[in-house]
Amino acid sequence: MLEVLKPLASLWHIIAFACGFLFVFQSYLALFGQVRYDRRHNRIIRYADRHLWLSGFAIIAIGLLINGPETYLSNPKLWTKVTLITIWAISTETIRGYALPRLRLGQRLPMLVAGTVSLACWIYGAFLGVAHGLAYGKAPLWALMAGFPIVLLGLSILALKLKASLALSVDNP
């Protein structure tokens, strides 16, 4: 029965990811004037967040039952994901409690920074979700963790380029 529940929980997680990522990415692009911001997306993003947490806990519970706590909890990929989710949760709360109020006052930089960290978490989290070959010690924790700053650096470079192109389009209408 658990072998059937595991892919169903994974499907639930993928659907929540897809719905959330679509609107998170659109909101991110709106910071650069690439698309129009739509406040209605916030509700969908929060709903997706909730379902990512619930489905993630379900996946962990099923993994613990199938593999046993000793094996499942010794997986460096699991702890990389836990670390990444912690960073994502902090960035989400930073967006809601700090960056969004600043954005409403016309200060975009806090939202750009927090949004870039959040988007990097979404992208690297998706990679870890499908990188089954790296599980159970096939890649050490340090190597798995090293991928996140690389993704964050890439997105930061992209953000700088988008910000520069926005400045050019404002200066040269």
Model-identified regions with their sequence ranges:
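Polytopic transmembrane helical bundles with strong interfacial aromatic enrichment
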Residues: 1-173
